[in-house]
Every structure is written in C-alpha cells, then in structure tokens.
Amino acid sequence: MKLLIALFVLVNAVIAQNGYGQGGQGPYGGQGGFGGYGGLGGQAGFGGQIGFNGQGGVGGQLGVGQGGVSPGQGGFAAQGPPNQYQPGYGSPVGSGHFHGGNPVDAGYIHGNHHEYPEHHGDHHREHHEHHGHHEHHGHHRH
C-alpha cells in the first residue's frame, strides 16, 4: 500500500509541474486530477471525483488514457490537408486537357462555316436587288 501511495505522490508532483489539473476539488487530483477535463484521464482523471479514494477511485469515470487518445487523433487530422492538395493539383491538368480538345472542335466547325459564306454571296446579291424595291416602299410610307 505504501508503494502505491508513493507512486501517487510522485505522479501528482509531475502533473503539478505540467499544469494538468493541479489539486482539483480533492487532495490527490480531485476533479482535475491527472489531466483534468481533456488531458490524460478525461473528466474524472487519475483520482476520481473526490480524490485518492473518492467515488471515482484510481480511474475515475473515464480512466487514464482516453483523453490521451484525443491528441493523437488531432495529429492524424493534419494529414488531411496534404491529401486535399493532391486533388487540387490533378484538377488543373484535367482542365487543361479539356481546353486543348475544345478549340480543335471549334476549329472544325469554323472550317465548315467558311464554305457556306461563298454560297451566301449569291444570296446576298439577291437581297441587294430586293433592297431597291424596299426603297419604293419607303416612299409609300411618306
């Protein structure tokens, strides 16, 4: 039993230095205990709600370790942004390919249109002759 108490005192001293819930409500950690609300021991921490022997005992409501997993998850989340960058890099390349294909298609259509204007030339002349008649209509308007 003496060894366990000595270990607790040692642990508490180290935690006090790190600022992990100093003292709390009870003597040996209390509510803050070994990590307080989000540290190494979750809500109850190392000493439970009241301390060394209180309601939570040496494990409290969440025990030692659950809080420690949280920081690990945060580290993994950092890997997300680099992954997001890769799709961004790929997108412009795809866009470029699309752009290259479109102008060629447009060129083809333009070529076809060039053949039509020659045929349209005759039609345009006919329209010019009709315009002469239109001048007459203009006089009628007067």
From Swiss-Prot:
Residues 65-77 have a biased composition (Gly residues). Residues 65-142 are annotated as: Disordered. It is found in: Secreted. It comes from the Eukaryota. Residues 1-16 form the signal peptide. The keyword Secreted applies. Residues 112-124 have a biased composition (Basic and acidic residues). Keywords: Developmental protein, Secreted, Signal. GO terms for cellular component: extracellular region. Residues 125-142 have a biased composition (Basic residues). Likely to be involved in the establishment of the head. This is Protein spalt-accessory. It comes from Drosophila orena (Fruit fly).
